[in-house]
Amino acid sequence: MGNPKSNQQPFVPQHIGTKPREAGGNKGKQMQDQSGQHPQVIQTKGE
């Protein structure tokens, strides 16, 4: 038996991937692929 609360809400996971990324402190919205193009990868070190 748990500790029942008066106003229980259904469990909604807050994990990464369940919500669309929005612009905040990081540039999630800005860095998202919006136009269907491939991201421009800048090679910084030799592979």
Curated annotation (Swiss-Prot):
Q: Which Pfam families match?
A: SspN
What is the superkingdom listed in this entry's lineage?
A: Bacteria
Quote the biased-composition stretches of kind Polar residues, using this chain's numbering: 1-11, 29-47
Subcellular localization, as worded in the UniProt entry:
Spore core
Which residues lie within the region annotated Disordered?
1-47
Induction behaviour:
Expressed only in the forespore compartment of sporulating cells.
Where would you find the membrane-spanning parts of this chain? Answer: none
Q: Which family does it belong to?
A: Belongs to the SspN family.
UniProt name for this protein: Small, acid-soluble spore protein N
